[in-house]
Amino acid sequence: MSEPRRHLGAGAALSVVVQGGPLIAGAVLSVVIARTIGPAGNGDFALLLTLAGISAMVASVGLTAGITYEVSRRRWSVKQAFRASYLAGFAFGLVGALAGLAVFALLQDSVFNHMRTELALLALASVPPLLAYQYADAILLARERYEGYAALELSHSATLVLIGGILVFPFGLTGALVGLPAAAVVGAATGVLLLVRESRRDTVRDGGGSLLRALRFGLQSWGANLLQQVNYRFDLIILGGFASAAAVGVYSVALTMTAVAWVLPQALQTVLFPRAASLDESALAGEITSDDSDAAVAKAVRHGVLLTLPAAVIIIALLLVAIPVLYGSKFHDSILLGFVLLPGVLLLGIGKVLSSAIAGRGYPRFTLYIAAISMPLTLGLYFLLIPLYDEWGAAAASSVSYALSALLALVFFRRVTKIGLRRALVPLSEDVADYGGLLHLARAWRPGR
């Protein structure tokens, strides 16, 4: 028998705070860099941050998704998952950092604008501890320890702002980059403290082979994530090869601001994946009916649709108010670039929730298919539009790519769940009423309940 499930809204609400942490940290650091060393410095930081992020994603081999899937289905104990994932994180991370350094050396005189090698080393030093703390995240989410998950993510974000934001003044770009490994180390250390405590309350007995099962599952998600990086991050890399560092910096601000639209749907996505897996396992065990499982998934998707409205309002306000006030006149084009990105960003927010349900039902290979289908079109658009229109071409290509990914996610969601489009996409009055109930829940909230 599974443990009593926590209110999904409570997890999503905490996840909103968590998802906002890295974005706020990145935005604050971006503003500080822009004000101290200008658009070119902002562009260089964005490129190195992208390099470290892609290196970590490649090195992770999708184990994050596999850990969440296995632990949430009560097949892997916290203690064993903790030990195996931290060892894997540091080993895989070292390989990823070395691979990232090789890519930097290859593109140093083109994409990376002749940046010094020690700057890349600083950014890539964050990869091993970053993977360890991400794996800790996965275990805590699978156990529905939302407060621990929040503490872990926010400790990472706060360290990034404090260290990088302070050191950028005396040391410029180098100081900002120091924040990346510092934040990752703090995150990994916080994960150790939280998982040691969580392992003492875990009652799951291992049946053996959990790491291999997690790797098999994760590799399918990893393939999808690897291909999706073409949609999410290669625009910056390719733009860096054709445009100036200042153009990359201006475009990166538009990306940062519009990415805020993903905070709400990603919060829902984050808690839906382990919940969908847990519900599916319970349905197979006869603890609940298949219709109960479908109803919970459909409700979550409808909330994803509802959340696009406040997300759009927030982004428009950020573009029109925050950019002029925080970044200044040199970043005026970031406003218009943000509006080009906005339609695709909003649609992809819904697509992320759909993809989470697909993977939670045990079909991560379909998310791989989505990425494999959209990647060729995305690359074609990037190489067609970016050489001609620089950052404007990047924004248009990215927006179209995001929309295509959302459409494909909807197609495969229907194939996996058989849930009707109206049932999944048209919000009900009871869905709106849920937000009033969430406020009541917040007033009565106690950790772990």
Predicted segments, located by residue:
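Interhelical loop/hinge segments that connect adjacent transmembrane helices in multipass membrane
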Residues: M1-P4, L8, L121, E147, ...
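Signature of the first transmembrane helix
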Residues: P4-T64, V161, R216-A246, T256, ...
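Membrane-water interface segments that mark the loop-to-transmembrane alpha-helix transition
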Residues: G9-L23, L48, S60-A105, E118, ...
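Interfacial segments at transmembrane-helix termini and the short loops linking adjacent helices
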Residues: P39, L106-A123, A295-A298, I316-L346, ...
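Transmembrane helix-bundle signature of multi-pass secondary active exporters and lipid flippases
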Residues: L49-M57, Q228, Y251-P274, T308-A311, ...
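Helix-loop junctions and terminal segments of transmembrane helices
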Residues: A59-W76, L141-A142, A254, T258-V297, ...
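Membrane-interface junctions at transmembrane-helix termini in multi-pass inner-membrane proteins
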Residues: E70, P129-A151, P343-A371
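Hydrophobic alpha-helical transmembrane segments
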Residues: T117-L124, A150-S199, F217, L377, ...
